Regions:
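Active-site residues of response regulator receiver
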Residues: 55, 83
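Acidic catalytic/metal-coordinating carboxylates
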Residues: 36, 62-65
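AAA+ ATPase active-site-proximal loops
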Residues: 129-151
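Two-component/phosphorelay signaling modules centered on CheY-like receiver
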Residues: 14-32, 38-39
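C-terminal output helix
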Residues: 87-89, 107-116
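Conserved acidic carboxylate
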Residues: 11
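Short amphipathic alpha-helix used as the core "switch/output" element in two-component signaling
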Residues: 42, 64-75
Length: 151
């Protein structure tokens, strides 16, 4: 089996960062974290990062300029940009600049793992029965909500 791939999460929301970190560690990725662009640049320089998962808006710098810096350094690290609905235009801009994809917030575990599998060539994420049932019940609740509005 190959070496564990190391991913960098660049996210200033510490709760979301911790959730993402736990999901990735559970999927057997190595995980580094940074809360702003300067610390993300340092981590990229000092480590063999296989992929960067970054928020667009950061307290110091932003995910777009981090991507631009990475490209200017001749690095070929795939970037995935996370964004809230209000910043979808930023995500589209990032993809045009070279980001591999973007994820809308809130980020969902299965969606993230399937995206990473596609980008890094790893096996599909197989959700547990519990997470499947949770997703199913959320989908059913959403369907019920829409049906009530229509009725």
């Amino acid at each position: 089996m190959g070496m564990k791939k190391t991913l960098l999460i660049v996210e200033d929301n510490l709760i979301l960062c911790d959730i993402l970190k736990r999901w990735l560690q559970k999927a057997n990725y190595g995980v580094l974290t940074a809360i702003d662009e300067p610390s993300a640049r340092r981590k990229i320089k000092e480590n063999d990062v296989a992929l960067v998962l970054t928020d667009v808006r950061l307290p110091e710098g932003d995910g777009i300029s981090l991507l631009e810096w990475s490209i200017s350094q001749g690095l070929h690290i795939p970037f995935v940009v996370m964004t809230e609905y209000a910043t979808i235009a930023d995500a589209v801009h990032a993809v045009k600049l070279g980001a591999k994809d973007y994820l809308p917030k809130p980020v969902h575990e299965v969606q993230l793992m399937d995206l990473l599998r596609g980008l890094l060539g790893l096996p599909f994420f197989v959700p547990s029965k519990k997470s499947f049932m949770k997703r199913r019940s959320l989908a059913i609740r959403e369907t019920d909500r829409i049906a009530c509005r229509v009725a």
